[in-house]
Protein backbone atom coordinates (compact mmCIF):
# COMPACT_ATOMS: atom_id res chain seq x y z
CA UNK A 1 0.00 0.00 0.00
CA UNK A 2 2.95 2.33 0.38
CA UNK A 3 5.45 3.66 -2.13
CA UNK A 4 8.75 1.96 -1.45
CA UNK A 5 11.66 0.67 -3.47
CA UNK A 6 11.39 -2.62 -1.59
CA UNK A 7 7.61 -3.05 -1.92
CA UNK A 8 6.36 -6.41 -3.21
CA UNK A 9 2.98 -6.65 -4.91
CA UNK A 10 1.47 -10.11 -5.44
CA UNK A 11 -1.30 -10.79 -7.94
CA UNK A 12 -3.85 -13.58 -8.05
CA UNK A 13 -2.97 -16.40 -10.42
CA UNK A 14 -4.95 -16.28 -13.67
CA UNK A 15 -6.58 -19.48 -14.96
CA UNK A 16 -4.97 -21.04 -18.02
CA UNK A 17 -7.00 -23.25 -20.37
CA UNK A 18 -5.63 -25.51 -23.08
CA UNK A 19 -7.39 -25.45 -26.43
CA UNK A 20 -11.17 -25.44 -26.13
CA UNK A 21 -11.12 -26.64 -22.54
CA UNK A 22 -13.50 -24.69 -20.29
CA UNK A 23 -12.89 -26.22 -16.87
CA UNK A 24 -9.91 -27.07 -14.68
CA UNK A 25 -10.57 -29.06 -11.50
CA UNK A 26 -8.11 -29.97 -8.77
CA UNK A 27 -9.25 -31.86 -5.65
CA UNK A 28 -6.83 -32.84 -2.91
CA UNK A 29 -6.80 -34.30 0.59
CA UNK A 30 -3.89 -34.23 3.03
CA UNK A 31 -3.62 -35.94 6.38
CA UNK A 32 -1.18 -36.20 9.23
CA UNK A 33 -0.60 -36.88 12.89
CA UNK A 34 -2.95 -35.77 15.66
CA UNK A 35 -6.08 -36.38 13.53
CA UNK A 36 -5.00 -33.77 10.99
CA UNK A 37 -7.08 -33.59 7.81
CA UNK A 38 -6.83 -30.97 5.07
CA UNK A 39 -9.15 -31.26 2.03
CA UNK A 40 -8.97 -28.64 -0.73
CA UNK A 41 -10.66 -27.80 -4.03
CA UNK A 42 -9.77 -25.55 -6.97
CA UNK A 43 -12.23 -25.04 -9.84
CA UNK A 44 -11.45 -22.76 -12.76
CA UNK A 45 -14.09 -22.02 -15.39
CA UNK A 46 -14.03 -20.11 -18.68
CA UNK A 47 -17.34 -18.46 -19.55
CA UNK A 48 -16.11 -17.15 -22.91
CA UNK A 49 -12.96 -15.77 -24.49
CA UNK A 50 -13.13 -12.65 -22.32
CA UNK A 51 -14.33 -13.77 -18.87
CA UNK A 52 -13.10 -16.54 -16.58
CA UNK A 53 -13.32 -17.32 -12.88
CA UNK A 54 -11.75 -19.43 -10.16
CA UNK A 55 -13.07 -20.84 -6.89
CA UNK A 56 -10.66 -22.10 -4.26
CA UNK A 57 -11.59 -23.54 -0.88
CA UNK A 58 -9.73 -25.36 1.88
CA UNK A 59 -10.58 -26.83 5.27
CA UNK A 60 -8.16 -27.97 7.96
CA UNK A 61 -8.65 -29.65 11.32
CA UNK A 62 -6.21 -31.03 13.85
CA UNK A 63 -6.90 -32.23 17.38
CA UNK A 64 -3.45 -31.26 18.65
CA UNK A 65 -3.65 -34.16 21.11
CA UNK A 66 -0.09 -35.43 21.14
CA UNK A 67 1.53 -37.45 23.89
CA UNK A 68 4.58 -36.21 25.76
CA UNK A 69 6.65 -37.48 28.67
CA UNK A 70 7.83 -35.44 31.64
CA UNK A 71 9.14 -36.07 35.15
CA UNK A 72 6.92 -35.29 38.13
CA UNK A 73 8.38 -33.86 41.30
CA UNK A 74 9.25 -36.69 43.71
CA UNK A 75 7.80 -39.22 41.32
CA UNK A 76 8.29 -41.28 38.20
CA UNK A 77 8.22 -40.11 34.62
CA UNK A 78 4.70 -39.92 33.30
CA UNK A 79 3.01 -39.65 29.93
CA UNK A 80 0.37 -36.99 29.32
CA UNK A 81 -1.68 -35.77 26.37
CA UNK A 82 -1.81 -32.12 25.38
CA UNK A 83 -5.32 -30.72 25.79
CA UNK A 84 -7.15 -27.84 24.11
CA UNK A 85 -4.74 -27.72 21.18
CA UNK A 86 -7.29 -28.21 18.41
CA UNK A 87 -7.43 -25.95 15.34
CA UNK A 88 -10.23 -25.55 12.78
CA UNK A 89 -9.77 -23.44 9.67
CA UNK A 90 -11.86 -22.65 6.58
CA UNK A 91 -10.72 -20.60 3.58
CA UNK A 92 -12.88 -19.52 0.63
CA UNK A 93 -11.77 -17.54 -2.43
CA UNK A 94 -13.65 -16.48 -5.56
CA UNK A 95 -12.07 -14.46 -8.36
CA UNK A 96 -13.19 -13.16 -11.76
CA UNK A 97 -10.97 -12.09 -14.65
CA UNK A 98 -12.07 -10.10 -17.67
CA UNK A 99 -10.62 -8.64 -20.84
CA UNK A 100 -11.73 -5.45 -22.55
CA UNK A 101 -10.62 -4.12 -25.96
CA UNK A 102 -7.72 -2.11 -24.55
CA UNK A 103 -7.21 -3.54 -21.09
CA UNK A 104 -8.38 -5.91 -18.39
CA UNK A 105 -10.16 -6.07 -15.04
CA UNK A 106 -10.02 -8.37 -12.01
CA UNK A 107 -12.20 -8.87 -8.93
CA UNK A 108 -11.74 -11.11 -5.91
CA UNK A 109 -13.46 -12.02 -2.64
CA UNK A 110 -11.66 -13.80 0.21
CA UNK A 111 -12.87 -15.28 3.51
CA UNK A 112 -10.84 -16.93 6.27
CA UNK A 113 -12.41 -18.27 9.45
CA UNK A 114 -10.71 -20.18 12.26
CA UNK A 115 -11.14 -21.39 15.82
CA UNK A 116 -8.36 -22.64 18.09
CA UNK A 117 -7.54 -23.50 21.65
CA UNK A 118 -4.58 -22.50 23.78
CA UNK A 119 -3.06 -25.47 25.65
CA UNK A 120 -1.66 -24.97 29.13
CA UNK A 121 1.76 -25.58 30.62
CA UNK A 122 2.88 -28.89 32.14
CA UNK A 123 3.74 -28.32 35.83
CA UNK A 124 5.91 -30.87 37.63
CA UNK A 125 4.55 -30.11 41.10
CA UNK A 126 0.90 -30.40 40.16
CA UNK A 127 0.27 -32.18 36.86
CA UNK A 128 -2.93 -30.98 35.23
CA UNK A 129 -3.17 -27.88 37.42
CA UNK A 130 -3.47 -25.47 34.48
CA UNK A 131 -6.24 -26.72 32.23
CA UNK A 132 -6.15 -23.64 29.98
CA UNK A 133 -9.51 -23.74 28.21
CA UNK A 134 -8.86 -20.40 26.46
CA UNK A 135 -10.31 -20.10 22.95
CA UNK A 136 -9.81 -17.74 20.03
CA UNK A 137 -11.93 -17.09 16.93
CA UNK A 138 -10.69 -15.20 13.87
CA UNK A 139 -12.46 -13.93 10.75
CA UNK A 140 -10.72 -12.15 7.87
CA UNK A 141 -12.69 -10.91 4.87
CA UNK A 142 -11.79 -8.72 1.93
CA UNK A 143 -13.08 -7.81 -1.52
CA UNK A 144 -10.89 -6.10 -4.06
CA UNK A 145 -10.86 -5.10 -7.70
CA UNK A 146 -8.44 -3.83 -10.33
CA UNK A 147 -8.97 -2.05 -13.66
CA UNK A 148 -6.35 -1.29 -16.30
CA UNK A 149 -6.94 0.30 -19.69
CA UNK A 150 -4.91 1.98 -22.45
CA UNK A 151 -7.24 4.77 -23.47
CA UNK A 152 -4.80 6.43 -25.87
CA UNK A 153 -1.39 5.51 -27.26
CA UNK A 154 0.00 8.13 -24.89
CA UNK A 155 -2.23 7.54 -21.82
CA UNK A 156 -3.09 4.53 -19.64
CA UNK A 157 -4.79 4.11 -16.27
CA UNK A 158 -4.47 1.54 -13.49
CA UNK A 159 -7.04 1.72 -10.66
CA UNK A 160 -7.31 -0.51 -7.59
CA UNK A 161 -9.80 -0.71 -4.74
CA UNK A 162 -10.11 -2.85 -1.61
CA UNK A 163 -12.29 -3.29 1.45
CA UNK A 164 -11.11 -5.47 4.36
CA UNK A 165 -12.75 -6.56 7.60
CA UNK A 166 -10.91 -8.35 10.44
CA UNK A 167 -12.47 -9.76 13.60
CA UNK A 168 -10.90 -11.43 16.64
CA UNK A 169 -12.66 -12.89 19.70
CA UNK A 170 -10.64 -14.16 22.68
CA UNK A 171 -12.32 -15.96 25.60
CA UNK A 172 -10.89 -17.09 28.93
CA UNK A 173 -13.64 -18.46 31.18
CA UNK A 174 -12.88 -19.30 34.85
CA UNK A 175 -15.95 -21.56 34.88
CA UNK A 176 -13.92 -23.89 32.66
CA UNK A 177 -10.51 -23.15 34.21
CA UNK A 178 -10.47 -21.77 37.76
CA UNK A 179 -6.81 -20.72 37.45
CA UNK A 180 -7.62 -17.94 34.97
CA UNK A 181 -9.40 -14.62 35.16
CA UNK A 182 -12.44 -13.83 33.03
CA UNK A 183 -11.52 -12.32 29.67
CA UNK A 184 -13.98 -11.92 26.80
CA UNK A 185 -12.50 -9.52 24.27
CA UNK A 186 -13.70 -8.54 20.80
CA UNK A 187 -11.62 -6.61 18.29
CA UNK A 188 -12.76 -5.35 14.88
CA UNK A 189 -10.82 -3.56 12.17
CA UNK A 190 -12.03 -2.19 8.83
CA UNK A 191 -9.96 -0.83 5.97
CA UNK A 192 -10.79 0.98 2.74
CA UNK A 193 -8.04 1.44 0.18
CA UNK A 194 -8.10 3.00 -3.29
CA UNK A 195 -5.36 3.95 -5.71
CA UNK A 196 -5.01 5.29 -9.24
CA UNK A 197 -1.90 5.46 -11.40
CA UNK A 198 -1.76 7.47 -14.64
CA UNK A 199 0.95 6.91 -17.24
CA UNK A 200 1.70 9.53 -19.90
CA UNK A 201 4.02 8.57 -22.76
CA UNK A 202 5.46 11.75 -24.22
CA UNK A 203 8.12 10.11 -26.38
CA UNK A 204 9.17 6.47 -26.72
CA UNK A 205 12.12 7.31 -24.49
CA UNK A 206 10.25 9.63 -22.11
CA UNK A 207 7.22 8.86 -19.96
CA UNK A 208 5.68 10.37 -16.83
CA UNK A 209 3.49 8.86 -14.14
CA UNK A 210 1.09 10.37 -11.65
CA UNK A 211 -0.35 8.27 -8.83
CA UNK A 212 -2.50 8.87 -5.78
CA UNK A 213 -3.66 6.69 -2.88
CA UNK A 214 -6.40 6.83 -0.28
CA UNK A 215 -6.48 4.67 2.83
CA UNK A 216 -8.78 4.68 5.84
CA UNK A 217 -8.43 2.21 8.75
CA UNK A 218 -10.64 2.05 11.83
CA UNK A 219 -10.32 -0.21 14.87
CA UNK A 220 -12.92 -0.97 17.50
CA UNK A 221 -13.04 -2.94 20.73
CA UNK A 222 -15.83 -3.50 23.25
CA UNK A 223 -13.41 -2.81 26.12
CA UNK A 224 -14.29 0.32 28.12
CA UNK A 225 -11.75 3.16 27.92
CA UNK A 226 -9.71 1.33 25.29
CA UNK A 227 -8.31 3.60 22.59
CA UNK A 228 -10.01 3.17 19.19
CA UNK A 229 -7.61 4.22 16.41
PLM feature spans:
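N-terminal periplasmic accessory domains that precede
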Residues: 1-28, 37-43
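Residues that define the transmembrane beta-barrel architecture of outer-membrane proteins
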Residues: 2-4, 30, 35-39, 86-90, ...
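Outer-envelope beta-barrel architecture signal
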Residues: 21-25, 37, 49-53, 90, ...
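Transmembrane beta-barrel strands of outer-membrane/channel proteins
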Residues: 27-31, 41, 55-61, 107-113, ...
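Gram-negative/organellar outer-membrane beta-barrel architecture
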Residues: 33-36, 50-65, 84-92
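Residues on the lipid-exposed face of transmembrane beta-strands in outer-membrane beta-barrel proteins
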Residues: 41-45, 92-98, 143-149, 194-200
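Flexible loop and strand-edge segments within Gram-negative outer membrane beta-barrel domains
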Residues: 62-68, 79-89, 102-157, 163-189
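Signature of Gram-negative outer-membrane beta-barrel scaffolds
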Residues: 206-229
Amino acid sequence: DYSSASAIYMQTRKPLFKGEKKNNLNIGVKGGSFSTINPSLLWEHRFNERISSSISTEYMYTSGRYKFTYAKKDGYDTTAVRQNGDVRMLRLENAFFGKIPKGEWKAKAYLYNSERGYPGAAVREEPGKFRHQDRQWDTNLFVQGSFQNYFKPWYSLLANGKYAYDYLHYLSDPRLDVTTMYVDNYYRQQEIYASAAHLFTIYPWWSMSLSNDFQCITGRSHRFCLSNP
